[in-house]
Each structure stands twice: as C-alpha cells, then as structure tokens.
C-alpha cells in the first residue's frame, strides 16, 4: 500500500470482529518515519454493543478523502482501493518533476 501521500488516517474497529485483522494491517503498513513526518493517525476501539460501524478513512495530501468498511474486504482489496488515488498522485508528482 502506497502511504506516502496520506495526511490523515482514521481506523475504527472492534478487536474481536472480522475487520480487526484488516484494520491492524492498515495501521502496520504506515511506516514509523511517516508517522514522525506529520501523518496524523487516529485509532478507535469499538465494542460489540456499539452501533458504530468499523471504518478506515484516509485523507490524502490533496485533501481528497476516501473511506471503506474493513469488514467487507480483505487487506489486499483495501490496499488496491487506496492505491488507486495514491498512484494518481504519484504520477502527478513525477510529471511535475520533469
């Protein structure tokens, strides 16, 4: 997963739900150096009694926001979903450099 264009990541999950693995992998995919360089990361644990839905929400450096329910997809599908916009930003960045 291309994370260098993320400015903010919000992950909300039940640690005992089926979305827990995907949510933890998303958090683990963000390198520590990026966390120190200003990417805001918020994680929230929800319980079975909560009616709040699990969520992974990413805000990119160009202010675009994307969000998905991690219980409906595996990590690879989620990574591909977020990588679509990251690849567009990467291409735009490469074109600006030349």
From Swiss-Prot:
Entry's Gene Ontology cellular component terms: mitochondrial inner membrane; mitochondrial large ribosomal subunit; mitochondrion
Keyword field contains Ribonucleoprotein: yes
Classification via InterPro entries: Ribosomal_mL53, Ribosomal_mL53_fung
Pfam families per record: MRP_L53
Keywords: Mitochondrion, Ribonucleoprotein, Ribosomal protein
One record GO biological process: mitochondrial translation
GO terms, molecular function: structural constituent of ribosome
Keyword Ribonucleoprotein annotated: yes
Subunit comment: Component of the mitochondrial large ribosomal subunit (mt-LSU). Mature yeast 74S mitochondrial ribosomes consist of a small (37S) and a large (54S) subunit. The 37S small subunit contains a 15S ribosomal RNA (15S mt-rRNA) and 34 different proteins. The 54S large subunit contains a 21S rRNA (21S mt-rRNA) and 46 different proteins.
PANTHER family named among the record's database cross-references: 54S RIBOSOMAL PROTEIN L44, MITOCHONDRIAL, LARGE RIBOSOMAL SUBUNIT PROTEIN ML53
Misc note: Present with 1550 molecules/cell in log phase SD medium.
Function: Component of the mitochondrial ribosome (mitoribosome), a dedicated translation machinery responsible for the synthesis of mitochondrial genome-encoded proteins, including at least some of the essential transmembrane subunits of the mitochondrial respiratory chain. The mitoribosomes are attached to the mitochondrial inner membrane and translation products are cotranslationally integrated into the membrane.
Protein name per the record: Large ribosomal subunit protein mL53
Protein species of origin: Saccharomyces cerevisiae (strain ATCC 204508 / S288c)
Gene assigned in the entry: MRPL44
């Amino acid at each position: 997963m291309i994370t260098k264009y993320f400015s903010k990541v919000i992950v909300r999950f039940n640690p005992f739900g089926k979305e827990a693995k995907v949510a933890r992998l998303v958090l683990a995919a963000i390198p520590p150096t990026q966390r120190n360089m200003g990417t805001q990361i918020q994680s929230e644990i929800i319980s079975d009694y909560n009616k709040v839905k699990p969520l992974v929400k990413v805000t990119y450096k160009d202010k675009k926001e994307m969000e998905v329910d991690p219980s409906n997809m595996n990590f690879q599908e989620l990574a591909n979903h977020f990588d679509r916009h990251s690849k567009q930003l990467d291409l735009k960045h490469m074109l600006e450099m030349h």
